[in-house]
Amino acid sequence: MQDTAKYLIHADITAAGVVERSDVVGAVFGQTEGLLGDELDLRDLQDSKKVGRIDVEIRSEGGQSFGEITVASGLDRVETAILAAALETIEQVGPCRAEIEVSEIEDVRSAKRREVVERATELLNDFEEKSIQTADIVETVRQQVRVADVTDYEGLPAGPRVADSDAIVVVEGRSDVMQLLKYGIKNAVAVEGTDVPDAIADLTAGRTVTSFLDGDRGGDLILKELAQVGDVDYVAVTPSDKSVEDLSRSEVMSALRDKVPYETVASAKSLDSIREEMSQAGESTTADGGAVAAATSDDAADNQPSPSSQTGSAKVETTDGTTSVVDNSNATAVADATTDEETTENGDGPTIPSLSDHIEAVIQTHSGTARLVDEDATLLAEGDADAVVSLLESTEDVPKTVVIDADCSQKLLDVAAQRGVDVVVAAGHGEYVKQPTAVQVRIES
């Protein structure tokens, strides 16, 4: 009955003499019989399993007896209270005067509810510790894919296209290879230290080799030794105070696009010096951009490319298996990736808007719309701000930035993290509990 009881009646008993348990039980049944009528007769209630057994704990001390009576009840609250009050009418136990006082009517279900709450709290805490957030799932999958793509070339970390590609990118460590894989470059190989392995030296023979090293002391040493034991065709340098593994996609592509022939910087003392020379050359090229473009156009019309000019192009293997050619000679055409940009500079093509232009058009004009743009600020999709989540889910290309004339919501952040969006530019902070670590929120008003 204890397992199905709703209430427990606790009563204290005091007897002026020595009594035993059987005396107490007999007094309870005997002196309550007929007191409450047939419906609440204690024996009938026990027979129908509405009242459990009567538990008595009794002890004698100094010629008196003390103890506790416990009765399990399956009746409702009113009937249980009546039954408890009936116990207090008992005045004699065996041959001794006695007094019974109900100390408590315990609600067994309340105790069970407390246990349920405590246990549920423990289970929930364990569950939350083991659960994976949406952003964590996305990042975990990305990392596992990157690690899976890292292959082994003569014991060195490398992209899957290193062995069969006619162009390779030499980097310092495994993390650099993984970073380039993240951006779709699959022909990178790591030297794993300042001592260039023989496998790398042999690999550079007969291939177009681009060194892409950190601009620190270690990078300087690797470049010098690589040039001594192998062949280096081009040098790409990272932005100041940055490592390859810390670069964004646009920074990686820009560095590889702007690489220079090794012969032109062979006398440089360090990668920092090369960076300075490239910066000065870039300023000079910008000043004379129109003339260079015109000369390039004439040369392309009058002359076929020679073998030497063809070797002036470096190749980068991308995720789709195609080979994009990036030409770094100041006298030849630039890479396809920059054709539209240079056409714009020469005034022959449409102007590509910047991210600031999108923000102004969407948020500052209170347009009530949303735009999805890529890393070059090219518009991928546009729609109503209220439908930005479905717009983001249905867009085939992964946008880098979402610009929305509305508050940033939790749903938008979750979907943005799933799609791999880097930045959400919104008109205001919305109600969101958790911001994914991979998504930056920027407020423009």
Curated annotation (Swiss-Prot):
SUPFAM superfamilies: DNA primase core
Residues binding Mg(2+) 1, per UniProt: E172, D214
Annotated GO CC locations: cytoplasm; DNA-directed RNA polymerase complex; exosome (RNase complex); primosome complex
Biased amino acid composition, Polar residues: 303-313
Gene Ontology biological process terms from the UniProt entry: DNA replication, synthesis of primer
Organism superkingdom: Archaea
Positions contributing to Mg(2+) 2 binding: D214, D216
Enzyme Commission numbers on file: 2.7.7.101
Cross-referenced PROSITE patterns: TOPRIM
Toprim domain: residues covered: 166-252
GO molecular function: DNA-directed RNA polymerase activity; metal ion binding; poly(A) binding
Subunit structure: Forms a ternary complex with MCM helicase and DNA.
Function text: RNA polymerase that catalyzes the synthesis of short RNA molecules used as primers for DNA polymerase during DNA replication.
Protein family according to the UniProt entry: Belongs to the archaeal DnaG primase family.
Name of the protein in question: DNA primase DnaG
Taxonomic source organism: Haloarcula marismortui (strain ATCC 43049 / DSM 3752 / JCM 8966 / VKM B-1809) (Halobacterium marismortui)
Lineage: Archaea, Methanobacteriati, Methanobacteriota, Stenosarchaea group, Halobacteria
Gene coding for it: dnaG
